């Protein structure tokens, strides 16, 4: 049992209120002006914000098969440090969770080593990237969160349509990395100013938006919940906006780096700035920000993609795609958008908690009496530089090295258990 004393919580209007919070038996038992500590532990939250634990539906934990990049343990330690209490792990592992047996093995490993809640995706196709569909029903029974072939787009419309029909029958979501392989052209960055300056092959916007346009029509026909991963282009935002207006059940996420950066920020041919989707144009970034504010884009997800140093500290042509994000998402977004008065604090918290929970019908993301005690304590005055040497993640690959941020998670509770406190994993 914990009593979080002298903290602040956000009310429904987005105003800060001074409150104590009682955690008992893994639940939020009481939120009140003052709670007397008669037993259990007192946690001093003076001057700090007590918020729901963050939810990230797009995380690469790499285990099994990629343990040199990340493990379930290190990835969930990174999540705890970043204030995340629920993360959803992508299936581009070896082996791929494309069968009941692999999924059950993965679930056992999660139970054994994870520091926070991990909800694993199953793949859509066998081995991830084939045209043979997995056994959707068996994988749902084994605990799959949803179905995705993240890392590659499902190339054949017929394959995707059949997958959507099967998912719809089980009330499960299809989550899509949208990329038409015939439109990538071997690109490593966005097909724009930076690619031209550096003489690099570029990935055009249509590689993403064309597949989203196809998929929203398939989702309408199948009656499926279709979720777009890491949306990055103005055309994609337009397609999703139109689909929502038409009543199609489509949701979308955006990553912190696509909100903060565009191609003009890239300092040179540095593998730590290579990600998929790539950093797009200023116009694309503006469309993403507009889409998030008007509800076209539903929430924020990191696409945490750790790699070993030798896979990133090379030119872009040779580097792996992806950057880490779990440990830096909140401070970056708070610094860039809340401190500059572009967003309210409540908007940011909602996009990292209740919005993803609502989209995927998860019973998390709220701080109220009776809710699961997934909690992050945030010091909104704390100032620190982003230093990969301090990361719990094995991946140190971030373009934000050295950036000064204000507003950091200082403690994280997962189902009432203190898993991170003042720089230490418990």
Curated annotation (Swiss-Prot):
Name one cellular component (GO) term: cytoplasm
A GO MF annotation of the entry reads: dihydroorotase activity
Q: Which branch of life, at top level?
A: Bacteria
- InterPro entries referenced in this protein's UniProt entry, alphabetically: Amidohydro-rel, DHOase, DHOase/Allantoinase_Hydrolase, Dihydroorotase_CS, Metal-dep_hydrolase_composite, Metal_Hydrolase
Essential cofactor(s): Zn(2+)
The record, for Gene3D superfamilies, names: Metal-dependent hydrolases (3.20.20.140), Urease, subunit C, domain 1 (2.30.40.10)
What protein am I looking at?
Dihydroorotase
Q: Write down the species.
A: Listeria monocytogenes serotype 4b (strain F2365)
Q: What does the organism's lineage look like at the top?
A: Bacteria, Bacillati, Bacillota, Bacilli, Bacillales
Record gene name? pyrC
